[in-house]
Regions:
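Residue-level marker of regulatory loop/turn positions in helix-turn-helix DNA-binding domains and
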Residues: 13, 44, 95
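N-terminal secretory signal peptides
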Residues: 1-19
């Protein structure tokens, strides 16, 4: 469900706002920014299937517990080192997204907050908070969705 707009708020698609932003930052800067946030759109190969299935299992676990339907796993050197269902509702923690839970689990199991060389698999494209957490943890790449869309390397964005 879309959130109602605040009184006087300018919709993001407003042509006047777009024109203003173009004048302010220049068309080239806007085109560059748009290309920087567009991830590669290709599906993962068959070698990723077991991890996509494991993320779906985490999603099913979240739903069975009465939580939001999201799941994620962290993989290093071909083995799962962390997993997590969404616990936002059950833990009453707005930061307990599946990706964050999987990153926390992997860090605990590996004994390090540095997850360099790890891959994150998620049932949906991670939100900005989760992608930023993956970035700061050093996650190498992430895949999302039922067919494992290649989301590229995690990056910071606004």
């Amino acid at each position: 469900m879309a959130e109602p707009e605040a009184a006087g708020a300018v919709p993001a698609t407003d042509p006047e706002r777009r024109a203003f932003m173009t004048r302010l930052f220049g068309a080239g800067a806007l085109a560059l920014a748009a290309s920087a946030v567009a991830p590669p759109a290709r599906a993962a190969g068959p070698e990723h299937a077991p991890f996509i299935v494991r993320a779906q299992d985490m999603r099913a676990r979240a739903l069975a517990a009465g939580d939001q339907g999201f799941g994620a796993v962290v993989v290093k050197d071909g083995r799962v080192v962390g997993d997590g269902p969404s616990r936002v509702v059950t833990a009453t923690d707005p930061t307990a997204h599946a990706e964050i839970e999987a990153i926390r689990d992997a860090a605990r199991k590996l004994g390090s907050s540095n997850l360099a060389g790890c891959i994150l698999y998620s049932t949906f494209r991670p939100c900005r908070m989760c992608e930023a957490a993956a970035y700061w943890a050093g996650v190498q790449r992430f895949y999302h969705g039922a067919d494992g869309q290649d989301g590229g390397a995690p990056r910071l964005g606004c």
